[in-house]
A protein has these predicted regions:
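Short, well-ordered beta-to-alpha junction loops that form the rim of enzyme active sites
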Residues: 91-93, 123-126, 159-160
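Active-site adenylate/phosphate-handling loop in enzymes that bind or generate adenylated species
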Residues: 106-154
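Alpha-helical elements of Rossmann-like donor-binding domains used by nucleotide-donor carbohydrate transfer enzymes
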Residues: 19-23, 74-77, 104, 108, ...
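The feature marks non-catalytic terminal segments
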Residues: 1-2, 54-56, 74, 78-82, ...
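Short, well-ordered secondary-structure micro-motifs
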Residues: 44-46, 99-101, 133-134, 166-169, ...
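Active-site rim/loop-helix segments in enzyme catalytic domains that contact anionic ligands
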Residues: 1-116, 146, 230
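Residue-level detector of flexible, active-site-proximal loop/helix-junction positions
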Residues: 38-40, 94-96, 128, 162-164, ...
């Protein structure tokens, strides 16, 4: 089975569903991760297209380009830890995806779906403080609209700690819980591959917080550790 994970930034895939990804690959499913935005915070002029439009001198631009290269290396390392070898980067501007037309973002996702033919698509929750996450949810829902020739049977959204929980007043309401007790340490190891993204507790992107979140969802679902998801669409040929 082909599983497509569409995220805005490098590390979102680990924070949201690193344990579940590992569970899929352990069970011999194929997982593809698509990173839509750069993950390098945008201090750029409007209508950003590439590094030349940064409002910085050449040295600073070069440093940011090197940082982006390092971030992509970290992403591939994290993916490998989770058992994933297929990672694609789209390089949309970070925290500015609302400046890109929904059609352009949707078409990028549609092309990936056309070639990869996933059975399940995961993406961000609609209820998220990060604008890139919200844009991606909308684009993914459009790209996965059910048609007779579409391979997708399920569309599922996930939370990203340090982003989803800060959205108000509507909130992420999970109805799927995946047991990651055996995969939690792998998730932590994959997160630590992002050497510049880890924070100290009590930040939600700290190692301790990731453990707490997994344990918390476990208490909700009768498990020792879990990742939480919200089912967006489930097309089934058999009765529930």
């Amino acid at each position: 089975m082909n599983i497509l994970v569409i995220v805005a930034h490098p590390d979102d895939e680990v924070l949201g569903m690193g344990g579940t990804i590992k569970k899929y690959t352990k069970n011999k499913h194929d997982v593809k991760i698509v990173i839509m935005a750069t993950g390098i915070f945008a201090r750029r002029s409007q209508n950003y297209q590439n590094s030349t439009s940064y409002k910085f001198d050449k040295k600073t631009i070069k440093n940011m380009e090197m940082e982006l290269v390092d971030l992509k290396k970290d992403c591939k390392k994290a993916a490998k830890i989770m058992g994933v070898t297929d990672v694609e980067f789209m390089d949309f501007p970070d925290n500015e995806m609302d400046t890109i037309s929904n059609l352009e973002v949707t078409k990028k996702i549609e092309l990936v779906i056309e070639h990869y033919k996933p059975s399940i698509v995961f993406t961000h929750s609609k209820y998220d403080v990060n604008v890139d996450h919200r844009v991606l949810y909308d684009a993914t829902i459009t790209a996965t609209r059910p048609t007779s020739n579409l391979s997708i049977k399920k569309v599922i959204s996930f939370e990203v700690p340090s982003s989803t929980e800060w959205y108000f007043p509507s909130q992420f309401s999970p109805n799927i819980f995946v047991d990651i007790n055996k995969e939690l340490e792998t998730k932590i190891k994959a997160l630590m591959a992002y050497k510049n993204e880890i924070r100290d507790f009590p930040h939600p992107r700290s190692v301790d917080a990731i453990r707490v979140i997994a344990k918390r969802w476990g208490t909700v679902s009768g498990l020792h550790a879990a990742e939480a998801f919200s089912l967006v669409r489930d097309i089934n040929n058999s009765v529930p």
